Protein backbone atom coordinates (compact mmCIF):
# COMPACT_ATOMS: atom_id res chain seq x y z
CA UNK A 1 0.00 0.00 0.00
CA UNK A 2 1.10 3.60 -0.62
CA UNK A 3 1.15 6.29 2.05
CA UNK A 4 1.28 10.08 2.28
CA UNK A 5 2.52 12.44 4.97
CA UNK A 6 0.97 15.83 5.70
CA UNK A 7 2.87 18.39 7.77
CA UNK A 8 1.40 21.60 9.19
CA UNK A 9 4.12 23.96 10.42
CA UNK A 10 1.86 26.14 12.55
CA UNK A 11 2.40 29.05 14.89
CA UNK A 12 2.14 26.99 18.07
CA UNK A 13 3.26 23.56 16.90
CA UNK A 14 4.06 21.26 14.02
CA UNK A 15 1.49 18.56 13.34
CA UNK A 16 2.35 15.58 11.15
CA UNK A 17 -0.10 12.93 9.94
CA UNK A 18 0.57 9.72 7.98
CA UNK A 19 -2.34 8.65 5.75
CA UNK A 20 -2.96 5.58 3.66
CA UNK A 21 -4.10 5.94 0.05
CA UNK A 22 -7.74 5.77 1.17
CA UNK A 23 -7.25 8.84 3.38
CA UNK A 24 -7.35 6.93 6.65
CA UNK A 25 -5.10 8.27 9.41
CA UNK A 26 -2.43 5.72 10.26
CA UNK A 27 -0.39 7.78 12.75
CA UNK A 28 -0.04 11.36 13.91
CA UNK A 29 2.28 13.40 16.09
CA UNK A 30 2.74 16.99 17.15
CA UNK A 31 5.49 19.04 18.73
CA UNK A 32 4.98 22.43 20.39
CA UNK A 33 7.51 25.25 20.24
CA UNK A 34 7.71 28.68 21.81
CA UNK A 35 6.63 32.05 20.52
CA UNK A 36 9.05 34.76 21.61
CA UNK A 37 7.72 38.24 22.38
CA UNK A 38 10.79 40.32 23.33
CA UNK A 39 8.72 43.53 23.23
CA UNK A 40 5.02 44.37 23.20
CA UNK A 41 3.67 43.75 19.69
CA UNK A 42 6.66 41.68 18.58
CA UNK A 43 6.40 37.99 17.66
CA UNK A 44 9.35 35.81 16.70
CA UNK A 45 10.16 32.14 16.35
CA UNK A 46 13.30 30.17 15.68
CA UNK A 47 13.23 28.45 12.27
CA UNK A 48 15.40 25.74 13.79
CA UNK A 49 12.47 24.88 16.07
CA UNK A 50 10.26 24.35 13.01
CA UNK A 51 12.87 22.13 11.35
CA UNK A 52 13.49 20.10 14.49
CA UNK A 53 9.75 19.63 15.11
CA UNK A 54 9.19 18.48 11.53
CA UNK A 55 12.02 15.95 11.70
CA UNK A 56 10.89 14.67 15.11
CA UNK A 57 7.24 14.26 14.13
CA UNK A 58 8.03 12.64 10.77
CA UNK A 59 10.32 10.17 12.52
CA UNK A 60 7.64 9.45 15.13
CA UNK A 61 4.78 8.76 12.68
CA UNK A 62 6.95 6.49 10.55
CA UNK A 63 8.24 4.60 13.58
CA UNK A 64 4.83 4.35 15.29
CA UNK A 65 3.12 3.16 12.11
CA UNK A 66 5.66 0.53 11.11
CA UNK A 67 5.28 1.72 7.50
CA UNK A 68 8.39 1.28 5.35
CA UNK A 69 9.84 4.62 4.23
CA UNK A 70 9.83 3.38 0.61
CA UNK A 71 6.04 3.05 0.79
CA UNK A 72 5.62 6.77 1.53
CA UNK A 73 4.99 8.27 -1.90
CA UNK A 74 4.29 11.91 -1.14
CA UNK A 75 4.73 14.70 1.35
CA UNK A 76 2.60 17.83 1.69
CA UNK A 77 3.61 20.84 3.75
CA UNK A 78 1.63 23.87 4.88
CA UNK A 79 3.06 26.63 6.98
CA UNK A 80 2.70 30.11 8.34
CA UNK A 81 2.70 32.92 5.81
CA UNK A 82 4.75 36.10 5.88
CA UNK A 83 7.44 34.98 8.31
CA UNK A 84 10.79 36.60 7.52
CA UNK A 85 13.55 34.00 7.55
CA UNK A 86 16.92 35.55 6.71
CA UNK A 87 19.80 33.28 5.70
CA UNK A 88 23.48 34.04 5.25
CA UNK A 89 25.67 32.93 2.35
CA UNK A 90 26.01 29.42 3.82
CA UNK A 91 22.24 29.06 4.29
CA UNK A 92 22.41 29.53 8.06
CA UNK A 93 19.67 31.40 9.92
CA UNK A 94 20.81 34.93 10.83
CA UNK A 95 18.15 35.90 13.36
CA UNK A 96 14.83 34.61 14.69
CA UNK A 97 11.98 34.78 12.20
CA UNK A 98 9.71 37.80 12.52
CA UNK A 99 6.38 36.02 12.07
CA UNK A 100 3.00 36.95 10.61
CA UNK A 101 1.45 38.42 13.78
CA UNK A 102 4.35 40.77 14.59
CA UNK A 103 3.34 44.45 14.59
CA UNK A 104 6.67 46.32 14.88
CA UNK A 105 6.86 47.59 11.29
CA UNK A 106 4.37 50.47 11.32
CA UNK A 107 7.07 53.04 10.41
CA UNK A 108 8.31 50.86 7.56
CA UNK A 109 4.77 50.53 6.21
CA UNK A 110 4.47 54.32 6.25
CA UNK A 111 7.86 54.57 4.47
CA UNK A 112 6.75 52.16 1.75
CA UNK A 113 3.44 53.96 1.25
CA UNK A 114 5.16 57.37 1.05
CA UNK A 115 7.83 56.20 -1.42
CA UNK A 116 5.61 54.13 -3.70
CA UNK A 117 2.20 55.71 -3.17
CA UNK A 118 -0.82 53.97 -1.70
CA UNK A 119 -2.59 53.38 -5.02
CA UNK A 120 0.56 52.22 -6.83
CA UNK A 121 1.41 49.86 -3.98
CA UNK A 122 -2.01 48.23 -4.25
CA UNK A 123 -1.68 48.12 -8.04
CA UNK A 124 1.68 46.34 -7.76
CA UNK A 125 1.00 44.00 -4.85
CA UNK A 126 -2.82 43.90 -4.56
CA UNK A 127 -2.34 44.97 -0.92
CA UNK A 128 -1.56 48.05 1.10
CA UNK A 129 1.64 48.01 3.15
CA UNK A 130 0.81 45.97 6.25
CA UNK A 131 2.80 45.17 9.38
CA UNK A 132 2.28 41.43 8.99
CA UNK A 133 3.77 41.25 5.51
CA UNK A 134 7.37 40.38 4.73
CA UNK A 135 8.51 43.49 2.84
CA UNK A 136 8.04 45.78 5.83
CA UNK A 137 9.95 43.30 8.00
CA UNK A 138 12.91 43.38 5.61
CA UNK A 139 12.92 47.18 5.85
CA UNK A 140 12.70 46.98 9.64
CA UNK A 141 15.81 44.79 9.77
CA UNK A 142 17.58 47.17 7.37
CA UNK A 143 16.67 50.14 9.59
CA UNK A 144 17.22 48.55 13.00
CA UNK A 145 19.69 45.67 12.57
CA UNK A 146 22.01 46.76 9.75
CA UNK A 147 24.57 44.10 10.70
CA UNK A 148 21.98 41.34 10.11
CA UNK A 149 20.72 43.01 6.93
CA UNK A 150 24.29 43.08 5.58
CA UNK A 151 24.73 39.34 6.26
CA UNK A 152 21.49 38.38 4.48
CA UNK A 153 21.93 36.59 1.15
CA UNK A 154 18.65 34.64 1.00
CA UNK A 155 15.10 35.23 2.25
Give the residues covered by each predicted segment:
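Structural signal for hydrophobic packing residues in well-ordered secondary-structure cores
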Residues: 58, 62-66, 113-117, 142-149
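Internal, well-ordered alpha-helical segments in soluble enzyme and binding-protein domains
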Residues: 105-108, 117, 134-137
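Internal helix-loop-helix
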Residues: 107-110, 123
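N-terminal glycine/serine-rich phosphate-binding loop of ATP-dependent small-molecule kinases
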Residues: 1-95, 123, 151
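Carbohydrate-associated surface elements
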Residues: 102
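Generic structural signal for well-ordered, non-membrane alpha-helical segments
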Residues: 47-54, 105, 131-134, 155
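Gly/Ser/Thr-rich active-site cleft segment
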Residues: 9-11, 22, 121-155
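Hydrophobic or amphipathic alpha-helical targeting/insertion segments
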Residues: 89-93, 111, 115-116, 120
Amino acid sequence: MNYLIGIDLGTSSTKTVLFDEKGEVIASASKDYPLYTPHNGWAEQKPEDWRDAALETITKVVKDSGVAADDIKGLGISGQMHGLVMLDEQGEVIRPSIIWCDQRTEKECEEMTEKVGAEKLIEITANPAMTGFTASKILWVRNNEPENYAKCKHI
